[in-house]
Design a protein with these regions (language model features):
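Glycine/proline-rich loop-helix segments at beta-alpha junctions forming the active-site rim
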Residues: 1-107
Length: 107
């Protein structure tokens, strides 16, 4: 996969090398000047795109702030299952908004 660093000895995703974002993200985003929705999946993407040091929980708590152009999402990992169970608003509020926004853009 594009800039995927591989797995640790325990089978977890390794963090992306900083060179990936420095080398590719601005160049890739420039290819899509009419991009209407960016899904920031995981803390690394959120920190880079939002230029923040906030935790995943802090960023996710402010998910409405950058709508309709940006929507942060947790990394799809078993490690986030506990977070998802504690933050029921994610499934109740954020996911329906994501579905609505994608449908809107698909028209």
């Amino acid at each position: 996969a594009f800039c995927f660093p591989g797995y640790s000895a325990q089978g977890a995703d390794l963090p992306p090398p900083k060179i990936c974002a420095a080398t590719w993200r601005a160049q890739m985003l420039a290819r899509y000047p009419n991009l209407e929705l960016q899904l920031l999946v995981g803390g690394y993407a959120q920190k880079w795109h939002l230029n923040t040091k906030a935790s995943l929980g802090q960023v996710m708590a402010q998910w409405r702030r950058d709508l309709p152009a940006i929507l942060p999402l947790p990394h799809p990992s078993w490690r986030n299952n506990a977070w998802l169970k504690k933050n029921l608003w994610f499934e109740a509020d954020l996911l329906p908004e994501l579905q609505r926004r994608v449908k809107e853009l698909m028209r």
